[in-house]
């Protein structure tokens, strides 16, 4: 069984990759260089793909800074500073317009080309920043796109979108990753680029806060280095 796995280099996508491997899939990882602010994640994606010994790792490059619209693609927009409790109140400025639609479309084309049966994505609807494209109704709609928009789908063999983390809290994702052997020290969750050696995560953005809180909830130390 072949599976394309969306791999950002973050905690969730890395766990999704290791889950796909545990499920017996022959894994083809796909990452995206869209000129994002947090380019450190690409180095992490390469490291994770190597550690997981994927069959192939593709990095697709395109430029979403051409129109910006997000703090992750426009450095003139400040990263938000808010509490975890405030994260579900509204869609934040770190939302990249239609990002998962774009990513899944690339993954679908890749999967159909290599005759993969599945596409894994590490979206999560419980501990998240309020993004609309991490929710079950979005995934269900994209599954229909996979069915209707491909030769395989029209012939009755639609590529399946697998979301093994969608109903897990961040702490449960870490527990699963621990069981699967995910090398957390190679992952990168921060919305800033980290600069320096070793790179330092900011500790303040939504993603850092959720990650740190989950490790703390489990009584574990996050192996990443933080500026604060």
From Swiss-Prot:
Cofactor: Zn(2+)
Reaction catalysis annotation: 7-carboxy-7-deazaguanine + NH4(+) + ATP = 7-cyano-7-deazaguanine + ADP + phosphate + H2O + H(+)
Pfam families: QueC (PF06508)
Molecular functions per Gene Ontology: ATP binding; ligase activity, forming carbon-nitrogen bonds; zinc ion binding
Cofactor binding note of this UniProt entry: Binds 1 zinc ion per subunit.
SUPFAM superfamilies referenced in this protein's UniProt entry, alphabetically: Adenine nucleotide alpha hydrolases-like
E.C. no: 6.3.4.20
One GO BP: queuosine biosynthetic process
Superkingdom, taxonomy of origin: Bacteria
Keyword annotations: ATP-binding, Ligase, Metal-binding, Nucleotide-binding, Queuosine biosynthesis, Zinc
Residues holding Zn(2+): 190, 202, 205, 208
Pathway in which the depicted protein is active: Purine metabolism; 7-cyano-7-deazaguanine biosynthesis
Record-linked InterPro entries: QueC (IPR018317), Rossmann-like_a/b/a_fold (IPR014729)
Biological role stated in the UniProt entry: Catalyzes the ATP-dependent conversion of 7-carboxy-7-deazaguanine (CDG) to 7-cyano-7-deazaguanine (preQ(0)).
NCBIfam families per UniProt: 7-cyano-7-deazaguanine synthase QueC
Name of this chain's protein: 7-cyano-7-deazaguanine synthase
Phylogenetic lineage: Bacteria, Bacillati, Cyanobacteriota, Cyanophyceae, Acaryochloridales
């Amino acid at each position: 069984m072949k599976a394309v796995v969306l791999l950002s280099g973050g905690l969730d996508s890395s766990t999704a990759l290791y889950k796909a491997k545990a499920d017996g899939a022959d894994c083809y990882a796909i990452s995206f260089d869209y000129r994002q602010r947090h380019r450190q994640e690409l180095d992490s994606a390469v490291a994770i793909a190597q550690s997981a010994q994927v069959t192939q790792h593709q990095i697709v490059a395109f430029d979403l800074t051409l129109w910006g619209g997000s703090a992750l693609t426009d450095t003139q927009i400040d990263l938000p500073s808010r509490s975890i409790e405030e994260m579900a109140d509204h869609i934040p400025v770190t939302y990249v317009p239609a990002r998962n639609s774009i990513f899944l479309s690339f993954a679908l084309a890749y999967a159909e080309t290599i005759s993969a049966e599945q596409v894994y994505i590490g979206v999560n609807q419980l501990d998240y920043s309020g993004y609309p494209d991490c929710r079950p109704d979005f995934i269900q709609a994209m599954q229909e796109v996979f069915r209707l928009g491909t030769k395989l789908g029209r012939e009755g063999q639609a590529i399946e979108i697998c979301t093994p983390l969608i109903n897990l809290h961040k702490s449960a994702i870490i527990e699963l990753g621990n069981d699967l052997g995910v090398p957390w020290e190679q992952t990168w969750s921060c919305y800033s680029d980290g600069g320096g050696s070793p790179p330092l995560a900011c500790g303040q953005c939504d993603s850092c806060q959720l990650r740190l809180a989950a490790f703390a909830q489990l009584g574990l130390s996050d192996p990443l280095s933080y500026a604060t």
